[in-house]
Amino acid sequence: MLETHDVSRCFSTPGGQFWALKDVSISAPEGKLTILKGRSGSGKTTLMNIMGALDKPTSGKVLLAGEDIVQLDERKRALIRRRSIGYVFQSVALIPMMSAYENVEYALRLAGMKSGRRERACECLRMVGLGQRMDHMPQEMSGGEQQRVAIARAIAHKPKVIFADEPTAELDTGTGLQVVKIFKDLCAGEGITIVMTTHDTGLMEIGDMVYELQDGEIIGK
């Protein structure tokens, strides 16, 4: 279970203080897909960054398996990011000179996996339906296929939680639905907790939990 309790985030701007989040409390159940919905500037990406240990709140708690990760020092937070969390961003950012397989295998090396990297990389690419495309370079793949490689890369080190920030924003509706179906399959088959941001109302009914943000506050669930 991943939870936030009364999370607020304030940024200093030339015009004064800007509260991007205001006392946000949500829960993302284990092995389920939780969607954060909202327009640009609603606070959903700020919330995701805090939940994913990429940023700290001004106040509030973030509990991962019962532990408040806000209180951990940066070394421990970095260890959690490396071992327990996977990230999928709107910009896929695959390494262009590496094949699909090499991109995933490289992520395993960075995660410190000593053996079994080839088997795990191939397994993850098969999970996302790219078993026959492992040797293809990113420029030889469609946008949807590249995003699937990014998902394979994110799950390779067997994280507890995956954070996906607008992963379907640059995809057509059909391809976007395929990506979300992969997320649902990973929740059901691998028990991974997935938190995803989107502004696409067509994806709302697919989430197990949906929270709507506006001006840094939860306005709907």
Q: What spans do the regions from the language model cover?
A:
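ABC family nucleotide-binding domain
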Residues: 2-213
